[in-house]
Structure formats: C-alpha cells, structure tokens
UniProtKB/Swiss-Prot annotation:
PTM-bearing positions, type N6-lipoyllysine: K65
Required cofactor(s): (R)-lipoate
Keywords from the UniProt entry: Lipoyl
Species of provenance: Chromohalobacter salexigens (strain ATCC BAA-138 / DSM 3043 / CIP 106854 / NCIMB 13768 / 1H11)
Keyword Transport applies: no
Cofactor descriptive note: Binds 1 lipoyl cofactor covalently.
Family: Belongs to the GcvH family.
Record-given protein name: Glycine cleavage system H protein
Coiled coil ranges: none
Any Pfam family: GCV_H
Assembly behavior: The glycine cleavage system is composed of four proteins: P, T, L and H.
Amino acid sequence: MSHIPANLRYTDSHEWVLDNGDGTVTIGITDHAQEALGDVVFVELPETGRELDAGEEFGVIESVKAASDLYLPLSGEIIAVNESLEDAPETVNDNPYEDGWIIKLKLAEPEALESLLDATAYDALVSAEED
C-alpha cells in the first residue's frame, strides 16, 4: 500500500506536486511510482533556467527494472534541481516525498495547480491500477 500525503497534488503519471505558496512548486515521483520502478540507480536532471510546457519531458529516472521519462505536470521555469540525487539516486526510493524531490518549478500559471488530482482522487487511481 502506497503512502499518499494529503497536502500534495498528483498526476495520473505518478508525479507529486507540492505548492510552496510563493508561485513555485516542488515535484517528485510518488511512493507508488518508486515501488513500481524498484531500486532507482540513476536520475537524469534537467538544466535550471529551462522553460518547459506541461507534458514536456524534463528528465529520466532509471531503475534496475526500467528507464522512465519524467514529464512536467505544469508549465514553468525550472529553478532548482536536486543535485544530491546524482550521487544518491536511491533517495527517491527511501524518501520520495521529502529528500527525494527532483525539481523545483516557477509556475507559468499558478491556477493550473487546481487541475491536478488531490490525494483522494490519486488514491482511487492507484487502487484501480492495483485491481
């Protein structure tokens, strides 16, 4: 059973989004996603300063099972990346919602956050996938 924090927003591709309250968000992959991937061995991080649209690829996460592209859930400018993942990619497995964050984004449209799933809707999505 995956852990799903109530204070986050989610995507149907299993990314989480934390509203930092200042027009920026922190983004990572969910507990469900890291469980499905298995042991993460590499995270390809984007360059800061890049402006991307929602749905664009921003990186790659590789595990012992597979490599998966990471897609931006919201449009904006990448303002920070979690460089500690370069030396310790397993942090995504150990602590996906805190130390395992991947990027921080300055939102192009802060109201777009409302279009993402809340914890209840994401829990229903995960439950449906597990059935």
